[in-house]
Curated annotation (Swiss-Prot):
GO biological process entries: proteolysis
CDD domains: M48B_HtpX_like
Gene: htpX
Cross-referenced InterPro entries: HtpX_protease, Pept_M48_protease_HtpX, Peptidase_M48
EC number(s) per entry: 3.4.24.-
Cofactor note: Binds 1 zinc ion per subunit.
Keyword list, A-Z: Cell inner membrane, Cell membrane, Hydrolase, Membrane, Metal-binding, Metalloprotease, Protease, Transmembrane, Transmembrane helix, Zinc
Residue ranges crossing the lipid bilayer per the database entry: 7-27, 29-49, 141-161, 178-198
Family as reported in the entry's similarity comment: Belongs to the peptidase M48B family.
Requisite cofactors: Zn(2+)
GO CC, one annotated term: plasma membrane
Protein name, as recorded: Protease HtpX homolog
Membrane topology annotation: Multi-pass membrane protein
HAMAP family: Pept_M48_protease_HtpX
């Protein structure tokens, strides 16, 4: 519940930032234009991102005859989650990972890499798939699309401020054009940065929500915790990092269950995933709470 509230608050802050910058830069009319353009830009992303992401990794649908145990696992988890069974895809890449895509539970797909099928045991894989179904159940693709729409509109407004200042369109009631240009440059840099940081924070909060949802769907928080621990250890392997840099598109890293790309402290500010240690700690705490007799 706390992470759900955090998501709502962050979306509110992002919206407030957009309204404030829009009114400051272009007034009501310019603000509406920027929002509409950003909305159309993300319309394609919302409806077709699943096909783009799957094609990007050369993923193919896994038929029931190929892996009946995997289909039965996903079908059981989907029933427990109360959603339709999604299609299952295999991404032929060595980096162990998984992701979900699709705009709603009726148009969803889960993808596993060949690497993750080789690394995890069935209990751990079940935990991972439950996490991905948690994303589907919670409509996280829709939430990220809303955040991207507002963030995109903010970036467009910042660009408008930058070019308007240099073209002299901001001269009305302005006796200090130098200050206007400096202010526009600052806005051009800071506004998109602030919007991006908020979008990343929303993404991190959704990972916590999906972890909890997945743990409850599978009934085994420790299965997911063990999988995350193993995947995180592998992600720090220099050889795997080299493979990830070649196989993983940074633009889709946010979709993965763990961030396959390494980075320093600054990069972590822009990370779409919370620290894996914190995710594991929360799952272990949830496992204790789910034990019979807890709190009595």
């Amino acid at each position: 519940m706390a992470n759900q509230l955090k998501t709502v608050l962050l979306l509110g802050v992002l919206t407030g930032l957009f309204l404030a910058i829009g009114h400051l830069v272009a007034g009501k009319q310019g603000m509406i234009i920027a929002f509409v353009v950003a909305l159309f830009m993300n319309f394609f992303s919302y409806f077709f991102s699943d096909k783009v992401a799957l094609a990007m990794y050369g993923a193919r649908e896994i038929m029931y005859e190929e892996a009946p145990w995997l289909h039965e696992m996903v079908e059981d988890l989907a029933k427990r989650a109360g959603i339709p069974k999604p299609k299952i895809y295999l991404a032929p890449i060595a980096v162990p990972n998984a992701f979900a895509t699709g705009r709603d539970p009726n148009h969803a797909a889960v993808a596993v890499t060949s690497g993750i099928l080789q690394i995890l045991d069935k209990d751990e894989l079940r935990g991972v798939l439950a996490h991905e179904l948690g994303h589907v159940k919670n409509r996280d693709i829709l939430i990220s699309s809303i955040a991207a729409t507002i963030g995109g509109a903010i970036s467009m407004l910042a660009n408008m401020a930058y070019y308007t200042a240099f073209l002299g369109g901001n001269d009305r009631e302005n006796n200090n054009p130098i200050a206007s240009i400096i202010g526009s440059i600052i806005l051009f840099i800071v506004a998109p940065l602030a919007a991006t940081l908020i979008q990343m924070a929303i993404s991190r909060s959704r990972e916590f929500v999906a972890d909890e949802a997945g743990a409850k769907i599978s009934g085994c928080p420790l299965c997911l915790a063990n999988a995350l621990r193993r995947l995180e250890e592998i992600a720090h392997n220099p050889q795997i990092q080299e493979i990830a840099s070649q196989e993983i598109n940074p633009g889709t890293a946010h979709m993965m269950i763990v961030n396959p790309l390494s980075g320093d402290f600054i990069m972590k500010l822009f990370s779409t995933h919370p620290p894996t240690e914190e995710r594991i700690r929360r799952l272990e705490e949830l496992a204790r709470k789910m034990q019979p007799g807890y709190g009595f």
